[in-house]
């Protein structure tokens, strides 16, 4: 997924959570499997854009604040990133869906059942969203990657 994307887009909370772990993995400061370290190095190199009204500093390599009107800023980012923008933030995903700014969805289903925490589209959507399945791929770690395109 990361190899096929030109940028990451996160909300502040997701950025802070990711920044607290992955740069240290990339630098070899945290023991991790080779596949995790490789992913961390790729994540370190890719441009990362953050939507935040409160955070002003972005010390992680290649991290930038996405400024201005959300719709316009995301449209501009998508236009400037032909490889695609990979979104990873529950709250931001719901807002971008409401603004009709998500073209495709990659859902990663992990072999775990969480008893708490945020859920995708927790606050709902204005209408049912029809999707067309592009692919479904099981990974060696038990995760299933499901790729959908908007049908409407």
Spans of features found by a protein language model:
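Enzymes that bind and transform nitrogen-containing heteroaromatic metabolites
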Residues: 1-152
